[in-house]
């Protein structure tokens, strides 16, 4: 009998998933337990940053956990199989170290460089295509979650994807909240028509929405602060060098696990560089480029949410939330970021 991923998860994840959807849709298990989806359980949502002491997090929340959680949120609010599956599949093309590959592809700002592979991966999966045929669902109804506004929409609106990674990062990865607060936030959400007459998630209560903005504004800075930008670019540059030296193919990044690539790095000439980063406690910054030192100087995707409270953006009705959003958006990314011991020549 085939293993069931949902039976293997720990109690913290079970409790979280149960908040998102108390009545788990059993039909979803067949899709979760396909080879292509199960591969995602070995990829961290932290884009590899979890492997460095620069970050405090020890909770491994996988790309698969995120996909399941997004699917549960969509199912909770829509009870629509096609939309739910589009959410489950939205990161099926996620490679090792997640968005680090976008940094390899020089896609710092949109971080969408891998999404073109989604259709191809689903189409080439005999398991998934058989299930879709069984359920009378067309590939083009589930391979693009941008089609469904509850699944995904444009910043600064609230969608299932944006909501999920905010909740799980706050709860598990960066410990900015606890399970009771997550439950309070989630249970305050409803679906309304936004200013464009399109369905969007909204809060019922201004106070809860303000708490959510406080959390997401802090997270948004974490996603692009010095240690994060440095870590993602360093890992991307190491992988790029491994690729140039034929030690790792681009295909490997979609087939291997995070730990497999780490093992390859440890057996390469980049071992010392990786271990300096792995054991580092704090990055250094400079307004000018440090001489002969490997440094990172780039912007990154700005993730922020200005949610609706009933039918109005919170920034229009709450000065505290407006200031939190403005502070988040004004975060300075002009500095050069570096670590002692890693030279420019090492990665050029």
Q: Which stretches of residues belong to each language-model region?
A:
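Short alpha-helical catalytic segment bearing the HExxH-like zincin motif
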Residues: 83-91
């Amino acid at each position: 009998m085939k293993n069931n991923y949902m039976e293997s998860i720990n109690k913290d994840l079970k409790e979280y998933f149960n908040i998102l959807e108390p009545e788990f849709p059993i039909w979803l298990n067949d899709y979760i337990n396909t080879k292509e989806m199960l591969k995602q359980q070995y990829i961290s949502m932290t884009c590899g940053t979890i492997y460095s002491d620069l970050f405090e997090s020890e909770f491994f929340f996988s790309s698969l956990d995120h996909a399941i959680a997004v699917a549960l949120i969509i199912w909770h609010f829509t009870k629509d199989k096609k939309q739910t599956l589009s959410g489950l599949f939205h990161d099926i093309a996620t490679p090792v170290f997640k968005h680090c590959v976008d940094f390899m592809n020089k896609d710092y700002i949109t971080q969408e460089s891998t999404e073109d592979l989604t259709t191809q991966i689903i189409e080439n999966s005999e398991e998934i295509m058989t299930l879709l045929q069984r359920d009378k669902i067309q590939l083009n109804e589930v391979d693009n979650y941008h089609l469904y506004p509850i699944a995904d929409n444009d910043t600064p609106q609230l969608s299932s994807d944006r909501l999920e990674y905010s909740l799980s990062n706050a709860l598990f990865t960066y410990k900015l909240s606890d399970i009771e607060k997550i439950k309070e936030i989630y249970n305050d959400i409803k679906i309304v028509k936004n200013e464009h007459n399109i369905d969007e998630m909204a809060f019922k209560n201004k106070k809860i929405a303000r708490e959510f903005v406080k959390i997401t504004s802090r997270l948004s800075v974490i996603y692009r602060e010095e240690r994060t930008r440095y870590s993602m670019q360093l890992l991307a540059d190491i992988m790029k060098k491994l690729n140039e030296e034929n030690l790792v193919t681009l295909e490997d990044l979609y087939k291997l696990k995070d730990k497999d690539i780490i093992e390859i790095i440890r057996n390469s000439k980049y071992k010392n560089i990786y271990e300096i980063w792995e054991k580092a406690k704090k990055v250094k910054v400079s307004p000018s480029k440090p001489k002969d030192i490997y440094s990172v100087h780039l912007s990154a995707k700005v993730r922020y949410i200005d949610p609706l409270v009933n039918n109005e953006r919170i920034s229009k009705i709450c000065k505290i939330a407006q200031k939190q959003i403005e502070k988040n958006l004004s975060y300075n990314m002009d500095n050069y970021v570096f670590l002692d011991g890693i030279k420019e020549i090492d990665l050029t």
